[in-house]
Amino acid sequence: MLAAFQQQQTRKFSPITNTSASCLNIQPNPPKISIAPSVISVIGVHMEKNKLKVRTGQSTELSASVLPMQATNKELIWTNMNADVITLYPKGDTVTITGKSAGRAVVIVTTAEGKFRDLCIIHVQPYMTNPK
């Protein structure tokens, strides 16, 4: 940009009456200045819970936060490590977890760049009805 300012075109003209100017500085296209936004890198991801209980047939939500809060790319990837036990329904920084069958599963959240991850262990308990 500085070079564009230094290379301004100067042209010599005949003197203009009633003035003492003999040079005019003409800029047919003024330089365009743009400021690119800075990229704020991700330094981590944190899930709100590291253990969670849910009953079969019931749902609960789990959320995660990208650190710092001002990070440029806050995209998260949710992974279910045991699809027989739970089902995931991700939506941005939140995932809905539905218990399918009794057992344990692990939910992993990973930043879009893949550098940071966190996990939560899900315990699915059988749905119990009131005994007679």
From Swiss-Prot:
Disulfide bridge map: none
InterPro entries: Big_2 (IPR003343), Invasin/intimin_cell_adhesion (IPR008964)
Top-level taxon: Bacteria
Domain BIG2 per the UniProt entry, residue ranges: 44-115
Pfam families per record: Big_2
UniProt similarity note: To B.cereus BC1230.
Protein's name according to its UniProt entry: Uncharacterized protein BA_1245/GBAA_1245/BAS1153
Organism from which the protein derives: Bacillus anthracis
